[in-house]
Curated annotation (Swiss-Prot):
Keyword Transcription among UniProt keywords: no
Class of enzymatic activity (EC top level): transferase
Name recorded for this polypeptide: 3-deoxy-manno-octulosonate cytidylyltransferase
E.C. number(s) listed in UniProt: 2.7.7.38
Protein purpose: Activates KDO (a required 8-carbon sugar) for incorporation into bacterial lipopolysaccharide in Gram-negative bacteria.
Alphabetical list of Pfam families matching this protein: CTP_transf_3
Gene coding for it: kdsB
Catalytic activity: 3-deoxy-alpha-D-manno-oct-2-ulosonate + CTP = CMP-3-deoxy-beta-D-manno-octulosonate + diphosphate
Cellular localization per UniProt: Cytoplasm
Organism: Pelobacter propionicus (strain DSM 2379 / NBRC 103807 / OttBd1)
Amino acid sequence: MNITAVIPARFASVRFPGKALAIIDGKPMIQHVYERTARASLVDSVIIATDDERIQQAVSVFGGVCRMTRNDHETGTDRLAEVAGTLSADIIVNVQGDEPLIAPEMIDQAIRPLLDDPSLRMATLKSRIRCLHDFLSPNVVKVVTDRDGNALYFSRSPLPFFRDKWQDLKDESFASGKLLCYKHVGLYVYRRDFLVEFAAMAPTFLETSEKLEQLRALENGARIRVVETEFESIGVDTPDDLVKARERFRAIQSK
């Protein structure tokens, strides 16, 4: 069983161009992601997938493995699938290139369900929502699951809708666990053959409505196992997020 992690990385990010090469604690962000991914105990190899020579050059400098891809991909999944189609790996892990504090344990947590259940083709992560802002924010994707941990739905809207408590929602309700709900953590694990199949599927109604690719899998009847993680990461989507990531690195070093 070979497990390969692929980190899609673009230079031309809409909200933060060049963020993959933004320096955090003396290293480009993409290097932090690469090194943390390589420390996952279940991952055999790590590849960065990019269409930009500047990122390729940076990866070469720190000794990472990089694959150049086409520059017409609309999504990171499409870029991932192009690379996956050239690999002999059994399982492909999609690690976001803008999560410099991702814990290696998170990656192992997401992989394990596919090792335990041969019929499972896709898995991802969730973590507790602990404040009202995250519950209401369309930038925080919510997820609900069945009793076996399989995804029922992902949404940018509040999910579930607490009808009888809506007027009384406050931070304490979430922090205390009185209202238990979850946000999606965008790390995906696929069986390689399913990833190639998934990328070839036509976009679906719910996917295009919510702008969430994973809904394409649900609408086509795929089962997605969602594992709860206690680890927290920081996604760097804006320059403000970069400031927060740098502060977190400094805090870790000062301990």
